[in-house]
From Swiss-Prot:
Protein name in UniProt: Nucleoprotein
Record GO terms (molecular function): RNA binding
Family membership noted in the UniProt record: Belongs to the orthobunyavirus nucleocapsid protein family.
Annotated positions binding RNA: 14-15, 18, 47, 50, 75, 81, 94, 123, 125, 128, 166, 176, 182-184, 217
GO biological process, one term: symbiont-mediated suppression of host gene expression
Protein's organism: Bunyamwera virus
Domain of life: Viruses
Domain notes: The N-terminus and C-terminus are involved in homooligomerization and play an essential role in viral RNA synthesis.
Function: Encapsidates the genome protecting it from nucleases. The encapsidated genomic RNA is termed the nucleocapsid (NC) and serves as template for transcription and replication. The NC have a helical organization. Seems to participate in the nuclear relocalization of host PABP1, thereby inhibiting host cellular translation.
Subunit description: Homotetramer. Binds the viral genomic RNA. Interacts with host PABP1.
Length: 233
């Protein structure tokens, strides 16, 4: 006779992951030698990377992004999604958010020539396909990157506003706002900032709602080219 034995497993009722601490660790450990070209590869190949990881069962995978190597925990593989990730560990989602913040910090402090270099190299596919460009503001543009919602204060609530707008337009299910609604804002728990920062969220939503949203399959480079002939898309 076969005996099947089962034991109760204590549920993880609260997360100890702190995006601010994790981001500081990321900058300290992983940004030496990091270039805008490496970040460009990560974002323009984002869908391909995600698809590749979803097909591999390995828990830890090293990504080689044009020579910059970074190891991530593969939560994209269905069988790995419930695996606990260390607080200082990187996932594809965390890495995306960290790089978005890294770029914003650069944009806010570097020289104008370097800003132009960043804008020429970094393309946000999720923003571009909705007709949103760098001209709409760096905070807005970078807020379209997954993971930016970890830093609602840094990005001035734009990641949340983008999500709310998409839900209002029936372009996204409300359930996808859950992760954003669990985030802190400048140290404030969600239960606090959802009450005290309502005006700020509404202001961010006003900005997002006024953007020139339009679905397009034309690349940013193609739009710039056509604009020279008086064709705006």
């Amino acid at each position: 006779m076969i005996e099947l034995e089962f034991h109760d497993v204590a549920a993880n009722t609260s997360s100890t992951f702190d995006p601010e601490v994790a981001y500081a660790n990321f900058k300290r450990v992983h940004t030496t030698g990091l270039s805008y070209d490496h970040i460009r590869i990560f974002y323009i190949k984002g869908r391909e990377i995600k698809t590749s990881l979803a097909k591999r069962s390995e828990w830890e995978v090293t990504l080689n992004l044009g020579g910059w190597k970074i190891t991530v925990y593969n939560t994209n593989f269905p069988g790995n999604r419930n695996n606990p990730v260390p607080d200082d560990g990187l996932t594809l989602h965390r890495l995306s958010g960290f790089l978005a913040r890294y770029l914003l910090e650069k944009m806010l402090k570097v020289s104008e020539p370097e800003k132009l270099i960043i804008k020429s190299k970094i393309i946000n596919p999720l923003a571009e396909k909705n007709g949103i460009t760098w001209n709409d503001g760096e905070e807005v543009y970078l807020s379209f990157f997954p993971g930016s919602e970890m830093f609602l204060g840094t990005f001035r609530f734009y990641p949340l506003a983008i999500g709310i707008y998409k839900v209002q337009r029936k372009e996204m299910e409300p359930k996808y706002l859950e992760k954003t609604m669990r985030q802190r804002y400048m140290g404030l728990e969600a239960a606090t900032w959802t009450v005290s920062k309502l005006t700020e969220v509404q202001s961010a939503l006003t900005v997002v709602s006024s953007l020139g949203w339009k679905k397009t399959n034309v690349s940013a480079a193609a739009r710039d080219f056509l604009a020279k002939f008086g064709i705006n898309m």
